[in-house]
UniProtKB/Swiss-Prot annotation:
It comes from Gluconobacter oxydans (strain 621H). Belongs to the QueC family. The gene is queC. It is an enzyme of class 6 (ligase). This is 7-cyano-7-deazaguanine synthase. The keyword Nucleotide-binding applies. The lineage of its organism: Bacteria, Pseudomonadati, Pseudomonadota, Alphaproteobacteria, Acetobacterales. Catalyzes the ATP-dependent conversion of 7-carboxy-7-deazaguanine (CDG) to 7-cyano-7-deazaguanine (preQ(0)). The keyword Cell inner membrane does not apply.
Length: 242
């Protein structure tokens, strides 16, 4: 089987980071497909946001519409059933005994990327794009650069492929992620992702803030709000640095 050197598969949850990664991929590759996962997450509303974002991205420019390919959703309910975490159970968000946030789903990104690689092999895609980062993240060990590099080696050895795992957000924070969004598509794309992506762990799409929708109190909302505030402060029109 010949793997296309210019086809990408984006892990696309419907959140800010993965939406930015989708725009990044559409700016670089000839064909881009997306994959999302249903794993019993409390914020399953993000899966509904995926379709809206894909439609908006396709309408963003003729080039992006031509490049955007098929969407895939994979059922990983067993992952949620195994995980006693605040993302998959009705539990108060806090720290676990090991010091990690109890929103950490053990092995989630490793499993996501493994399934993505299996799908990429079937879809003849060499490039796999994920929005993990270790700049202003929650301490999840499967978001670290070392983990992703090790996994790339493992997947290529185990599947006899030459996949490239791309992490365009690995070394930038949430404010810089908005900068990247603006660089990719101007204020129009910033507004699109602000309005239609979802970050809130509580699945709240009823309360709208200047940074997007969410409960405004969970760690994901706090991180997004802080990133938006710093992004706005850095813009010349708001008196920040150029």
């Amino acid at each position: 089987m010949t793997i296309s050197s210019n086809t990408a598969l984006v892990l696309f949850s419907g959140g800010q980071d993965s939406a930015t990664c989708l725009a990044w991929a559409l700016s670089r590759f000839d064909r881009v497909e997306t994959v999302g996962y249903a794993y019993g997450q409390r914020h399953a509303i993000e899966l509904e946001c995926r379709e809206t974002l894909r439609n908006e991205m396709a309408a963003f420019s003729p080039d992006w519409k031509a490049r955007l390919g098929e969407d895939h959703t994979i059922d990983l309910a067993s992952l949620g059933a195994l995980s006693e975490t605040a993302l998959t159970r009705e539990a108060e968000i806090g720290l676990s005994e090991n010091g990690l946030p109890n929103t950490f789903v053990p092995g989630r990104n490793i499993i996501f990327l493994t399934f993505a690689a299996a799908l990429a092999a079937r879809r003849n895609a060499r490039h796999i794009v994920t929005g993990v980062c270790e700049t202003d993240y929650s301490g999840y060990p499967d978001c670290r650069d070392d983990t992703i590099k090790a996994l790339q080696v493992t997947l290529n050895l185990g599947m006899d492929q030459r996949f490239v795992l791309h992490t365009p957000l690995m070394w930038i924070d949430k404010a810089q992620t908005w900068d990247l969004t603006e660089e990719l598509g101007g204020q129009k794309l910033v507004n699109l992702i602000n309005r239609d992506s979802h970050s809130c762990y509580m699945g709240d799409r009823t309360h709208q803030h200047d940074w997007g929708y969410g409960c405004g109190t969970c760690p994901a909302c706090n991180l997004r709000a802080d990133g938006w505030r710093r992004y706005q402060q850095s813009r010349p029109s708001h008196g920040g640095a150029a």
